Amino acid sequence: MEIDLNADLGEGCGSDEALLDLVTSANIACGWHAGGAQAMRDCVRWAVEKGVSIGAHPSFHDPENFGRKEMDLPASEIYAGVLYQLGALSAIAQAEGGRIAHVKPHGALYNQAAREPEIADAVVSAIHDFDPSLAVFGLAKSGFVDAAQQAGLVAVEEVFADRGYRADGSLVPRSQPGALVDDENEMLARTLEMVRGQRVRAVTGEWVPLNAQTVCLHGDGPHALAFAKRIRDALEAAGIDVHAPGALHAGERA
């Protein structure tokens, strides 16, 4: 049994370098919701040094709301924005002796792509046209995963240790009760159940089947680093191999 651990980095949380000792895939903010050129370069350099798979973390252009405000934009504008962000991170990765291996949208773009086919298609098209060898990280069971697979991209299905789930496999919106799981012991138990049992309990009590291929560990919060280590240690103690998905090649030269 195996699993990938990923984290969203370059967002100003201050623990990026240390988190890269614990995760196997890094989703690096591309400047539109957080971060910037220097943060991107730092994260890429550390990821290359530590052999962590490099991923782009594009978003809507929304630094005021950390990329979490949903937007109604033309598909062509979404396509261009994703392409722009991929190009920026790819240039930095190439200069640092690495390459982008995957793409995981951020925030509202991630959530809207999971449920809105037009947005999913725009994001997938940008990724495919930029580099069809790139893998896509998307919410397990979502329409975004389906769209990526239909376009011929490798799709890696993602689950969250600290987010509440609805019965249809979607995440509880952050504005609603049950959206966030705060208890670390509960998060740890949920993670092990998602990886070993391939299921998660919804906020309404049902078991929801999931194809857990990568687990997102959020890097913000005062205890994020210690908790990330707890999760990694628990997975390895359970005999689960922790490494990047086979489709990704960490630290490869462009």
Swiss-Prot record:
The keyword Hydrolase applies. Its EC number is 3.5.2.9. Coiled coil: none annotated. One of its GO terms (biological process) is carbohydrate metabolic process. Keywords: ATP-binding, Hydrolase, Nucleotide-binding. It comes from the Bacteria. Pfam families: LamB_YcsF. It catalyses: 5-oxo-L-proline + ATP + 2 H2O = L-glutamate + ADP + phosphate + H(+). SUPFAM superfamilies: Glycoside hydrolase/deacetylase (SSF88713). It is an enzyme of class 3 (hydrolase). InterPro entries: Glyco_hydro/deAcase_b/a-brl, LamB/YcsF/PxpA-like. One of its GO terms (molecular function) is 5-oxoprolinase (ATP-hydrolyzing) activity. Belongs to the LamB/PxpA family. Forms a complex composed of PxpA, PxpB and PxpC. Catalyzes the cleavage of 5-oxoproline to form L-glutamate coupled to the hydrolysis of ATP to ADP and inorganic phosphate. This is 5-oxoprolinase subunit A. The lineage of its organism: Bacteria, Pseudomonadati, Pseudomonadota, Betaproteobacteria, Burkholderiales.
